Amino acid sequence: MDEIMSGEANDIQKSAYLTALAMKGETIDEITASAAGMREHCTRLLNDMDVLEIVGTGGDRSNSFNISTTSALVISAGGVPVAKHGNRSVSSRSGAADVLEKLGVEVALTAEQNETVLNETGICFMFAPVYHSSMKYAAPVRKELGVRTVFNILGPLSNPAAATMQLLGVYDKELAGTMVEVLSNLGVTRGVAVCGEDGLDEITLTGETDVHEIRFGEITSYTITPEQFGLSR
């Protein structure tokens, strides 16, 4: 991954590596190392507070509205610092950047600008193309391959502020368990990976949601239902 992100690997090497990983299935250690490699080559947002990331993998084909961005605003208003990392729409009606631009927010802020915004308001948005410029080395090969690769799940794991708290929506039940292990490996001390039984990369209102929770290195798994929160299906 380091050679891909630094531009040292050629297209044949990139294709072979990504295809081989996809065919055999990425392990927890391989996903962790890949995410760490992306973080190593990103522009960092420096801060002296514990911040929360709330994001989904996408890929659930639900065409839902951008739940994570609206939730981020509510969470921040409740006093939890949020450093959200995101991009434009992939599988939903609108991505985080699309929503914020419609609200009049300048999304392409530098790390220095976002440090000020975070300290003053308790929330900031890190637009992926600004912070992960090294993705330019992977983008052409990903487009040519035209299949799902490890990069499809690395975005939610590559927060430039090194968030220690995270709520991660995952489109696949089995993958959610893997992703929570990766989050723990990457330094998240409090967080959850969730997957709705209907395939949403969200906490669903139509049935049960699988939850995998990290609390300072200890991982527990359980399910929740809408009824537990006074909501009907």
What are these regions (language model features)?
Residues 56-61, 86-92, 131, 197-198:
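Acidic, glycine-rich active-site loops and adjacent beta-strand->loop/helix elements
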Residues 1-63, 74-78, 82, 232:
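Acidic, glycine/proline-rich low-complexity segments that act as flexible tails and inter-domain linkers
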Residues 40-43, 64, 79, 101-108, ...:
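Glycine-rich anion-binding loops and their surrounding alpha/beta cores
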Residues 6, 24, 55-58, 78, ...:
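Short glycine-rich loop/turn motifs that provide flexible caps or phosphate-binding loops at active sites
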Residues 18, 65-121:
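A glycine-rich phosphate/pyrophosphate-binding beta-strand-loop-alpha-helix module
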Residues 10, 14, 27-31, 35, ...:
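Generic structural signal for well-ordered, non-membrane alpha-helical segments
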